Design a protein with these regions (language model features):
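Catalytic domains of riboflavin
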Residues: 1-295
Length: 295
């Protein structure tokens, strides 16, 4: 029988679990259609399943590194809702599975590769192009584009006042997660655009530094899901609660890409412009020396 895998975060929102497990799996009952499944996965769906029926659902915890959790991981990579419809195949022989998948036009992915995907992307980042791009508040600017081996998400290093930077001295740095609505459209829902331009100006006034523009829209959930979260916020939820309603953690970002970019640029000591201690701790865990927090 097919099963629906959702994050434990989404399960707790639905009162289907009170445990901080990796994910939960729900058996799809006879007579269910796509709408019933969507009701459980998407808080914005029209509920066709009576909440009184939740107590009748057959639920189990998913293994932390099992295929159900990997299915959710694939959905996150694709910037979809963090849920997956799972069907087990009886034969576990790899050659048989490959043959079966080929006949049905399906892709075979190893669960381990899914769990390591974000780290693999970060570890394989390479600078692929660069150009001098004078900015309004920082005329001496070079932008370097980094891309992982699979051609996935691109991150940008905006290096300002390069001639003043010394590799043996701490570099003034800012990590900025991309925000289409704030950076480009001046959305009133956030101050990301103001933060971006202020950071560029401050780095230029300080003589130089680097701003990393990271492809982590919506705290790592992607633009489509961020718009879903905005719709939930319009009903009274804050940013964190809205993300959790969708089944995401409060913050899905990792900062290994930032650490790898700084390392490749030759900067091991950082004066980090942030009010977020998670960024400091994450860079330190990646082997960089954050010598100062600049508020």
């Amino acid at each position: 029988d097919p099963m629906l895998a959702i994050t434990a975060r989404r399960g707790m929102v639905l009162n289907l679990t009170d445990k901080a497990t990796a994910a939960i799996v729900i058996k799809c009952s006879n007579g269910w259609d796509a709408q019933n499944i969507l009701d459980l996965a998407n808080p914005l769906a029209d509920f066709g399943l009576n909440k009184d029926d939740y107590s009748k659902l057959e639920i189990k915890n998913a293994e932390k590194y099992g295929c159900e959790t990997a299915g959710i991981g694939l959905a996150k990579v694709a910037r979809l809702l963090p849920a997956a419809l799972i069907a087990h195949i009886a034969d576990n022989d790899a050659s048989v599975l490959d043959s079966w998948a080929t006949r049905h036009g399906l892709l075979v992915v190893d669960a381990g590769d899914v769990f390591q995907y974000e780290h693999t992307q970060a570890r394989t980042l390479k600078a692929v192009s660069e150009a001098k791009v004078p900015l309004l508040d920082a005329n001496d600017t070079r932008i370097i584009a980094f891309r992982p081996f699979d051609g996935g998400l691109e991150h940008l290093a905006i290096v300002i006042g390069e001639e003043n930077l010394k590799k043996d001295q701490p570099v003034l740095a800012r990590l900025h997660s991309e925000c289409f609505t704030g950076d480009l459209l001046a959305s009133l829902k956030c101050d990301c655009g103001d933060q971006l331009r202020s950071a560029i100006n401050e780095i230029a006034l300080a003589g130089g530094g680097v701003l990393l523009y990271l492809a982590q829209e919506g705290r790592g959930i992607g633009l489509v899901n961020k718009l879903r979260a905005y719709e939930l916020q319009d009903s009274g939820l804050d940013t964190i609660d809205a993300n959790e309603q969708l089944g995401f953690d409060a913050d899905e970002r990792i900062y290994l890409p930032a650490a790898e970019m700084l390392r490749q640029l030759g900067f091991e000591k950082i004066r980090l412009m942030t009010n977020n201690p998670d960024k400091i701790n994450s860079l330190a865990a990646c082997g960089l020396n954050v010598v100062e927090r600049v508020a």
